[in-house]
């Protein structure tokens, strides 16, 4: 199984995985509006892989099979001040 990964033109660190290059027919229109013009990031073989860097491999495969796409959102921002205060015991 291969997938094609696109980077969002509107949202930093947001990626859309689809089954075929330039085929967004199964992606909801509202999602595409918010995503912006997709920018090709890479073609990626999923078979034989044990993991992906920033996404759960099984969730990606299931989403591609069931709904035709997988949306990878950026991780939540770190609250360094909160971490520092908790480390200092001042929370």
Curated annotation (Swiss-Prot):
It comes from the Bacteria. Residues 1-85 form the YcgL domain. Gene3D superfamilies: YcgL domain. InterPro entries: YcgL-like_sf (IPR038068), YcgL_dom (IPR027354). It holds the Pfam family YcgL. This is YcgL domain-containing protein Ent638_2370. It comes from Enterobacter sp. (strain 638).
